Amino acid sequence: MRIPSLLAAGVAALGLLAGSLAAPVPAAEAAPRARWLLVADPTAHAVSVADASTGRITGALPGAVLGTHAGVIQMGHGRVAFVDEAGPRLDVVDIGSSGVPRIASSTPIPAVAGAWTRAGWISDDPGHRFVAVGSDIDGSTTQQVTVVDTRRQLARTAKISTSEVTLATTGERGTEEMETFLVGSPLRLVVTAGGRLDSYDVSAILGGDANPAPVATTPFGAYPHGPVADARGTVIGSTLHDGIETVPLTRGGFGASVSRAYPEPAVQSYRPRMAPDGETAVGTQTGTGPGAPTLLTSSSMRGAGVASVALGSGASTRAVVTPGYAAAVVTAGGVDTLSLVARGRAGLYDGAVTSVRLPGLGQVQGAGSAARFLAASDDGSELFLSRAGTGSVLEIDVAGTTATVRGTIAVPSALADGGYLATVDPHQRPHDLSGR
């Protein structure tokens, strides 16, 4: 259900939005292009789907606990995949023309490497047939990956050995999160927890090899925290503590890596996304300079290009990225500021910045109250912002550098920690091979 009246009051009270944030428009005038909005509230064991054009809740997956760290993989034609931590299991979900989500397959994830805590990272292949679910077992160099063939309804789980690294945060030896990739030809499972990249034969794992040996290995930087892969699955990499490293895939293993330092002193990028061009990674990170500003950093998968743009100080959402701009919301003192960063001529998101103060909707102050989640339609015409504890999602239309608040969508739960959002369009071409 859409609630435009709350926004009208909020915009009137602000009185400072001329030229940047237009007043709400009636629903009949809006022309949203994102068909469905997936809204998850793990604390409430709730996953629902809303019609982005009307705000109507069209269906739900009762009892599902969407793993927000691993996120959602877009598989195309209205199909998504995510880990339901209530299982745990990998759910492949189809959202059809009615907006009702249907579980196409549900694959249990056995615990073979130790007590299951959560899925760390999930990924699919460029053909969007296979999915890999990696574990996140703290303090252990023995992890596991479940590989699922969604076409054959076949799944196998393998134990994977990772390495200890010198932790950038403490200087001591320890373990990091394991990242997963499904890339290359023939198809390989590539994993890293820092220190090295290991490549495994997917056909051998699906054939029953539960303790596979790597078919190729190459050195890799420490402290990876954000897997990135181009849409064709030919180059992979990660955001590290001090910069970004990418490695091309060869038939026999790996090519020469390319490393580039962050342009501004910062903590490692937080969950970068792949841009629609399939070759540019974009994420938000916290700077270490005066005021610890939020930085929006973008980098090329194929060259040395990297750029950072300061957005202001405060708690930041994950970035979203569209063909024409990247965006994030920074919250400070209870005020949400949306920043749109235009895509530059070289393909990086380092162009003009448009910042917009968003209207308040009665969110309360207190621990966790600054939690937000931002999602964008594939073409960038719409943004959706959740706010912790409000039980609603703000809708924003974007045209050029003008953002127009359209209304809010009331959702079935409070979104106590900000929840999780993803847009799903049956005509959307997937360009990101990792869960986001």
Annotate each language-model stretch with its function.
Residues 33-41, 78-85, 127-138, 180, ...:
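Short beta-strand elements that form the blades of beta-propeller/WD-repeat-like
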Residues 44-46, 86-89, 136-141, 196-197, ...:
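Short glycine/acidic-enriched loop and turn motifs that connect beta-strands
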Residues 138-269, 273-275, 295:
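Solenoidal tandem-repeat scaffolds enriched in leucines and small polar residues
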Residues 93-100, 147-156, 200-209, 247-254, ...:
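Short loop/turn segments immediately following beta-strands, especially the blade-tip
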